[in-house]
UniProtKB/Swiss-Prot annotation:
GO molecular function: rRNA binding; structural constituent of ribosome
Name of the protein: Small ribosomal subunit protein uS4c
Protein source organism: Nephroselmis olivacea (Green alga)
Family annotation (CDD domains): S4 (cd00165)
GO CC annotations, alphabetized: chloroplast; small ribosomal subunit
Keyword Ribosomal protein: yes
Source taxonomy: Eukaryota, Viridiplantae, Chlorophyta, Nephroselmidophyceae, Nephroselmidales
Keywords of this entry: Chloroplast, Plastid, Ribonucleoprotein, Ribosomal protein, RNA-binding, rRNA-binding
Pfam families from the UniProt entry: Ribosomal_S4 (PF00163), S4 (PF01479)
Domain S4 RNA-binding: 90-152
Family per similarity comment: Belongs to the universal ribosomal protein uS4 family.
HAMAP family per record: Ribosomal_uS4_B (MF_01306_B)
Annotated segments matching region Disordered: 18-45
Subunit (UniProt): Part of the 30S ribosomal subunit. Contacts protein S5. The interaction surface between S4 and S5 is involved in control of translational fidelity.
Length: 202
């Protein structure tokens, strides 16, 4: 299943706040569609499915990628749900987004694939690259890269940088201090429902 390219606010109306997909908020609170406002108790399957879809749309990953992350999370020690969120949050595109260098995950992904981003002084063009503590995130030393990211940052206003990251705004650099803690995950999500959704599949 490919990444979503359709109307973003339609997804926000259905699933709720998704900061990685768009910073805009839906004016109408009811789900999209002709019968969106009709009250109907959702099934347990639908509740789990929609929670899983929040991860897909917020982090901009495919179903195949998300399944692989879930498999890795299950193999690791500790809570599978928290492991899954940490894997998604420590991606390079998510890190760029959480540092406030890009307004959405898609914008962060484009910065990376177009070669603007360095990790510990080495160019990395893979958005799914897993960042590690003590790595430094910076941009290429050319005016185009700096102008692009400064433009993004000037339009986003005040951004709260999570404690596992350190932003040096003047230098357009960030340091990864540690693996992110669950309480600082940038998405309202019940990861246990996602684990339950994938239980028959992994």
């Amino acid at each position: 299943m490919s990444r979503y390219r359709g109307p973003r606010l339609k997804i926000v109306r259905r699933l709720g706040e998704l900061p990685g997909l768009t910073r805009k908020m839906a004016k109408r609170k009811s789900p999209p569609g002709q019968h969106g406002a009709a009250s109907k108790k959702p099934s347990q399957y639908r509740i789990r499915l929609e929670e899983k879809q929040k991860l897909r749309y917020n982090y901009g990953v495919t179903e195949k990628q998300l399944l692989r992350y879930m498999q890795r999370a299950r193999r690791a020690k500790g809570s599978s749900g928290e492991n899954l969120l940490q894997l998604l949050e420590m991606r390079l595109d998510t890190t760029i987004f959480r540092l406030g260098m890009a307004p959405t995950m898609l914008s962060a992904r484009q910065l990376i694939t177009h070669g603007h981003i360095l990790v510990s002084e080495q160019r990395v063009n893979i958005p799914s690259y897993q960042c590690s503590p003590k790595e430094k995130i910076s941009i290429r030393s050319n005016s185009r890269s700096r102008k692009l990211i400064e433009g993004y940052m000037s339009t986003m206003g005040s951004i709260v940088t999570p404690p596992h990251l350190e932003l040096k705004k003047e230098k357009l650099e960030g340091n990864i201090q540690e693996i992110i803690d669950r309480q600082w995950v940038g998405l309202p999500i019940n990861e246990l429902l996602v684990v339950e959704y994938y239980s028959p599949k992994v």
